[in-house]
């Protein structure tokens, strides 16, 4: 009987909390992040272990480039649900952004944790595409002396190829573009277009022509082809 009474006493609060969450989520999707943050913070005061609320607050902090706050939210998520791959991926992402934008000497000490977070995401979810993209970016951006490796980037690109052909071609093209193998990158981006016809594939090829190969007319034609295809 007591449990029934407690349930009916708590029911209005539960409905209110869900209503507020829905409002916060709607504001987030509308990119009204400051307003959404206020709502999610109020929810967190009464429900400090609500995973989705914490994740939204982490996402908002990341968009605001408040790296320490975002790190704190994602770290809490890892503690509350240690087998969720995406929390490790997001944690590694904001930790990496803090490293890039902060003290370079401190950044060196963060590299292993960034890499380890992405690797953990893949270990928990072997089909995690975004974590592989993040590792590719990490390995091509880092100097060799602190762990950068083109061959390791290619390894993760090969893994992407098995999971998603378009991601495989785009990632290989990205690696080729980074190392100034523009003709090879062009081939990969064209393969991505052929199998997916995605906006991203067309945009990558157009950007390559315009920004790296000094062929603005080719870039224009690529974007026009995409526009005509969608029209």
Predicted segments with their positions:
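Canonical tetratricopeptide repeat
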Residues: 52, 56-59, 90, 134, ...
